[in-house]
Amino acid sequence: MTKKIPRIVLAINYVNYSDVKKKNWQKIAMDVMVKNSPSNVQLVTFNYKDDEVNVPQQFRVFKMLERNSQKTIGNTRPLPYVKDIFDFASQMNCDVFGYLNSDIMVHKEFFDVFDNYKKIDSYLFNRIDIADVSVATFNSKNFHIVWKDHPGFDGIFFRRKWWLINRKRFNDGLIVGEPEWDYYYNKVIRQSTGQIIKKRKLHHVYHNTIWNLTSNGAVNNRKINGAVA
């Protein structure tokens, strides 16, 4: 019997950065996604209707986001809610779907982890921080590792059937791009009865970002995460 190849949706939230370096890191990451994604992977970005979106043509653009944390809670940035992204992705024709931060890079073998998707419900991916790269140097693995033990999760994926049954376990109020939303998802996934895979499969160009822990979005996420043991 021929093994079924999973249909995968890889979603990002494209950011129209004004910072030239951040814009370039995001572009390289998207180009890497295009280069390394097999034919069974759909690349998509979810954005607001008025967003200026400049992605490679292989990405499908869905301007479906409505909830905006700047409007709902007075956040300093107009950031979306992570569950909205997961919910939109789960409505697509797929077996597995997930979200990556838009400046994350993956090698071709990243997608091998989904081969056994019928038995795995959730996937949590950590990153390795590396020095500046081009698409070619990243794919040749000719790069310098700066930090190999980053604790956060820059990518989370789900088996679609599991998510549709269990989505109510997850709080609606967590905001992408603010601290601790990923820690919250890790906790709730870990408390579920599903089968979980955790891997350090992602790469990211290192830059010394300091979280604004007093923003309304950060306070919101930390409060929700702190309420879960």
Predicted regions and their residues:
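C-terminal catalytic/acceptor-binding lobe
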Residues: 2-30, 167-229
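Short loop->beta transition adjacent to catalytic acidic/histidine clusters or analogous donor-positioning motifs
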Residues: 6-8, 31-45
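Preference for well-ordered, secondary-structure-rich cores of eukaryotic proteins
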Residues: 13-14, 33, 44-50, 104, ...
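Short, charged/polar "capping" segments at the starts of alpha-helices
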Residues: 19-22, 49-55, 131-134
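Short, hydrophobic beta-strand segments that form beta-sheet elements in well-ordered domains
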Residues: 40-49, 121-125
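Active-site-proximal specificity loops/subdomain of glycosyltransferases
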Residues: 45-95
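Conserved catalytic core of nucleotide-sugar-dependent glycosyltransferases
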Residues: 75-78, 86, 104-187
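Short beta-strand-to-loop acidic/aromatic patch adjacent to the donor-nucleotide binding site
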Residues: 94-107
